[in-house]
């Protein structure tokens, strides 16, 4: 048995989530090191691993109790075959509910012998015609009035995505399989036949308030399987996508329309399946975006030469043991293991030794587990809620208790549980976006990015503004995410003769959440593009430093060796010159190459004069050293750059600096997607593929799910 939602919420409130019993059917005990707080906590990685492991080719058997969200996604997006489980118990429950309803046809039964909603004061003995009347008034959505729009490649902008309709059909069959709804097995098989033959009803995008379930959208599904003459469907036949009337599509596959019996129209349309389907798909994508956000955070730490200590277990497991904060910190810590960019251990220094150096990373990196942890908690909770809603719930009305031979009039169709998960998820998406946006802008800002070139220009910044446009675009995406985060559920209007005076607006909220996923995908694709460029530029910097360290010593010996004879000034001079150069170079990363190095050594010359003031040093020697050192640095920089770019065409030298796990994402983008680091059109003297086209490749990999297993491999 799955735990109740109350028990899940209670365990979350105590930092001990039992949601895994609803999601995985099992528990994992995680001892929190040093905190003395044993927890039973499903992790987000567990959830994603299970979702992505859902098969796509084996038949999904629906029994009303075991459907999980990965199954819904595989049926909705991958066309996984679906059927009602071949079980005597299931057939018996369904048959008994139908028989019980038939025994009540002389009684006043809502939606069987009465009218609907605020019209439930009407009565009829024509139960079959009543179901037709139900569909008639609910088939009221706006779709193209002719096939011309479809032929011109338009017409679907006001219809639900086909994957949402397929997911809704899967969830609805699963719910009706429970035998609480008096809908015959032949009707369920009509739905699975549509799914398995790739016949998908065209359903209006708008027009439901998700109160008595999603009445109008589900009516279009019911109309299609019953062969309504004006019902349109999408089908793939002989390798071609077509929009046909439902009867035409059924004829292609020798399918017969079903005639809906008493309550069967109501049993099909009165439920939360459409909202639950769109919410499930939105949540699946939100999980993936959350993992991508964590991965980008780790890679930004690397690009910014940030501190792995921000994710130390003492900070999270011991001193603030929120389970999802622990998880996020652990994920990022794992991603940084073995990185040569990230600072893993920092020696304590005296007050004056690191003057002018930022002592710790800024909030977007340092507090990312504390920021993302609560959002991950909301996603895990939403997963538990939707697992119950899609896999273990009957959501129409009235419901039949076969064992006790009674019917119950209630409101399981009120989709507030779904709506609330979407409200929280959408708010979380905006907060994820805000975090990644601030990480991105810090990385692009020459005054904050620890010496990376302005706008991540690979060559002279005066003629390359590489990521400046992306900076602006990212601000637009983040602003839109903030707007979309506004609540939907506060905009309820009384409807249907004020009978549905409160309504969940779950599908509208799920639609807005799907939009947020899309916008966040754009933002994270932008971030990923930029962080890889930053990593490449940081690798060039590190390669340069390896070679320039000995060169500095050699130049100092060459120009000042005689002045330092018999003294202990050499080591002091080398150390102070290096510090002066590092500090000045970080302040001048918007300069072009040549003036930047001449400026840096002009500052370093002052350090030379200061250290060697007690010697016989001449100003001519200092000036000669200054010019020679600057020219040497300029020459070496160009040499290192050329070596890097030549090697990057095969296997980038940056890989050796990244952690083994972040190497996976770097290689996926650079090699599999073919998005290369950019030197600049002006420098190369030709116009290359646009920046936007390269970001688009990453965006498409996110939207298609191509990146999903890459992220799981990184975090497994």
UniProtKB/Swiss-Prot annotation:
Gene Ontology CC terms: cytoplasm
Residues at which (E)-cinnamate binds: 270, 360, 366, 397, 468, 496, 499
Coiled-coil portions: none
Gene3D superfamilies: Fumarase/aspartase (Central domain), Fumarase/aspartase (N-terminal domain), Phenylalanine ammonia-lyase 1, domain 3
pH-activity relationship: Optimum pH is 8.5.
UniProt pathway annotation: Phenylpropanoid metabolism; trans-cinnamate biosynthesis; trans-cinnamate from L-phenylalanine: step 1/1
InterPro entries documented for this protein: Aromatic_Lyase, Fumarase/histidase_N, L-Aspartase-like, Phe/His_NH3-lyase_AS, Phe_NH3-lyase, Phe_NH3-lyase_shielding_dom_sf
Pfam families in UniProt: Lyase_aromatic
GO molecular function, one term: phenylalanine ammonia-lyase activity
Keyword list, A-Z: Cytoplasm, Lyase, Phenylalanine catabolism, Phenylpropanoid metabolism
Covalent crosslink: 5-imidazolinone (Ala-Gly): 211-213
Function: Catalyzes the non-oxidative deamination of L-phenylalanine and L-tyrosine to form trans-cinnamic acid and p-coumaric acid respectively with similar efficiencies. Facilitates the commitment step in phenylpropanoid pathways that produce secondary metabolites such as lignins, coumarins and flavonoids.
Protein name: Phenylalanine/tyrosine ammonia-lyase
This protein's encoding gene: PAL
């Amino acid at each position: 048995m799955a735990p109740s939602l109350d028990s899940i919420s209670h365990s979350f409130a105590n930092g001990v989530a039992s949601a895994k019993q609803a999601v995985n059917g099992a528990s994992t005990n995680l001892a929190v090191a040093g905190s003395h707080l044993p927890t039973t906590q499903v992790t987000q990685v567990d959830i994603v691993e299970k979702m992505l492991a859902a098969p796509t080719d084996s038949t999904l058997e629906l029994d009303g109790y075991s459907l999980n969200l990965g199954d819904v996604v595989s049926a909705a997006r991958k066309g996984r075959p679906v059927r009602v489980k071949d079980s005597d118990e299931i057939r018996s429950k369904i048959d008994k509910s139908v028989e019980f309803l038939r025994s009540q046809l002389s009684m006043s039964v809502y939606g069987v012998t009465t009218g609907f909603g605020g019209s439930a004061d009407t009565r009829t003995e024509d139960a079959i015609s009543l179901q037709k009347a139900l569909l008639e008034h609910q088939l009221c959505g706006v779709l193209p009035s002719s096939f011309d729009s479809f032929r011109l490649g338009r017409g679907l902008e006001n219809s639900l995505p086909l994957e949402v309709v397929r997911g809704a059909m899967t969830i609805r069959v699963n719910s009706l399989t429970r035998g609480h709804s008096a809908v015959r097995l032949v009707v369920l098989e009509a739905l699975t036949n549509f799914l398995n033959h790739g016949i998908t009803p065209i359903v209006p995008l708008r027009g439901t308030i998700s109160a008595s379930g999603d009445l109008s959208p589900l009516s279009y599904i019911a109309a299609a399987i019953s062969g309504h003459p004006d019902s349109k469907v999408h089908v793939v036949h002989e390798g071609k996508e077509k929009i046909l009337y439902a009867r035409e599509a059924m004829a292609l596959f020798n399918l017969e329309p079903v005639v809906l019996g008493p309550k069967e129209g109501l049993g099909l349309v009165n439920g939360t399946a459409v909202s639950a389907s769109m919410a499930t798909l939105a949540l699946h994508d939100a999980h993936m975006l959350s993992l991508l956000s964590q991965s980008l955070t780790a890679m930004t730490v690397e690009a910014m030469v940030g501190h792995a200590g921000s994710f130390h277990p003492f900070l999270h497991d011991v001193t603030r043991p929120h389970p999802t904060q622990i998880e996020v910190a652990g994920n990022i810590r794992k991603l940084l293991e073995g990185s040569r960019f990230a600072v893993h251990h920092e020696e304590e220094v005296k007050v004056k030794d690191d003057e002018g150096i930022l002592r710790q990373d800024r909030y977007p990196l340092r507090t990312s587990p504390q920021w993302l942890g609560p959002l991950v908690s909301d996603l895990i909770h939403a997963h538990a809620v939707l697992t119950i809603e899609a896999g273990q719930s009957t959501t129409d009305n009235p419901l039949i208790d076969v064992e006790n031979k009674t019917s119950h009039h209630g409101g399981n169709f009120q989709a507030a549980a779904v709506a609330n998960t979407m409200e929280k998820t959408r708010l979380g998406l905006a907060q994820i976006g805000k975090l990644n946006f601030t990480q991105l802008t810090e990385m692009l800002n020459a005054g904050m990015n620890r010496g990376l070139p302005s706008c991540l220009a690979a060559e002279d910044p005066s003629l390359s503004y590489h990521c400046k446009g992306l900076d602006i675009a990212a601000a637009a995406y983040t602003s839109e995410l903030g707007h979309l985060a506004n609540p939907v559920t506060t905009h309820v209007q009384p409807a249907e003769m004020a009978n549905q005076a409160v309504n969940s607006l779950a599908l509208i909220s799920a639609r807005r959440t799907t939009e947020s996923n899309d916008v966040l995908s754009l933002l994270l694709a932008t971030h990923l593009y930029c962080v890889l460029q930053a990593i490449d530029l940081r690798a060039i910097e590190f390669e340069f430093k390896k070679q320039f360290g000995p060169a500095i010593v050699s130049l100092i010996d060459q120009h000042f060796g005689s002045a330092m004879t018999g003294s202990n000034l050499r080591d002091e001079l080398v150390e102070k010159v290096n510090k002066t150069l590092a500090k000045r170079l970080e302040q001048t990363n918007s300069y072009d190459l040549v003036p930047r190095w001449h400026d840096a050594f002009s500052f370093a010359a002052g350090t030379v004069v200061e250290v060697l003031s007690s010697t016989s040093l001449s100003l001519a020697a200092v000036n000669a050293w200054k010019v020679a050192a600057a020219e040497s640095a300029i020459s070496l920089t160009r040499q290192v750059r050329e070596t890097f770019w030549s090697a990057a065409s095969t296997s980038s030298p940056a890989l050796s600096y990244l952690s083994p796990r972040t190497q996976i994402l770097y290689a996926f983008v650079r090699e599999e997607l073919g998005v290369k680091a950019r030197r600049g059109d002006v420098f190369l003297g030709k116009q290359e593929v646009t920046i936007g086209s390269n970001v688009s490749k990453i965006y498409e990999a996110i939207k298609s799910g191509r990146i999903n297993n890459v992220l799981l491999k990184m975090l497994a």
